Amino acid sequence: MRNSLKNIFLIVFVSIISLGLYQYYQNYSEARSFNNFLDSAALVSSLHLEASEEFKNLLDFSEISREEFENKIDKVVSNSKEAYEIINNTDASLTLKEKELLSLATSYWLQGLEMFEVSIITLIDNPNSEKIQESIAQSISDLSIGDRSYSEFLFLTKQNATSEGTFLPVLYEIEYVGLEDNSFRFADLLVEKAKSSTGGLFLVRNLSISGAEFKPNPIAITEEDYSVLL
């Protein structure tokens, strides 16, 4: 009888220890995966902080040339693509609401920035383009969705970062256009700003004068049939 009780006690004790060790491993594994995700999120945040600040400067349009605009928007889109790749290369088995929100943000940001770049270049090449405001408005709408998704990601991440074993890196507040209620009005304002630019935004690149031909008109004809030029 004593041996039976002793064996039962031993089995219960071993089971409790095993369960505790398993739970500890599970918590450790989840914390490590979450920390790895946060490291990637910090890179994404840093890239989009730089891109969003440059993008806001571009929206001024006041004294920027076409070449400067193209170089800067290329850098902004490049940063966005890099951030998109980083978040999509994270552990596919990781199912987190935070990851879902950040993935949504990077996707809409990239989509909006690429459409914005194409739309403004189209406007520059053809200032009388019809319905250009629609594509610009769509890009603004996409950027706004990205801003909102990132804001929710940031809130949720900070809320859950209090868990034991979680190390919260620097995650920046990022906003491209904010919560824009009227993207079409925003687009109209951007088109007006762009068209009033004084920095050479609408100058055509790689356009040069290869030669000039002087064809003066005569102002009089002499009796000897010679033309008198001014």
Predicted segments, located by residue:
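Membrane-inserting hydrophobic helices used for pore formation or membrane fusion
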Residues: I140-F184
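Transmembrane signal-anchor/signal-peptide helices with a preference for the extracytoplasmic
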Residues: V14-D39
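Low-complexity, acidic Ser/Thr/Pro/Gly-rich terminal tails and inter-domain linkers that flank the onset
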Residues: F184-V228
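Solvent-exposed N-terminal domain segments of exported/luminal and surface proteins
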Residues: L123-P127
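Perimembrane helix-loop junctions in membrane proteins
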Residues: Q26-E30, F61, T122
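N-terminal Sec-pathway targeting helices
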Residues: M1-F13
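Intrinsically disordered, low-complexity Ser/Thr/Pro-rich tracts
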Residues: A31-L38, S45, L179-V191, A212
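Alpha-helical segments in soluble extracytoplasmic regions
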Residues: D39-I121, K131-F153
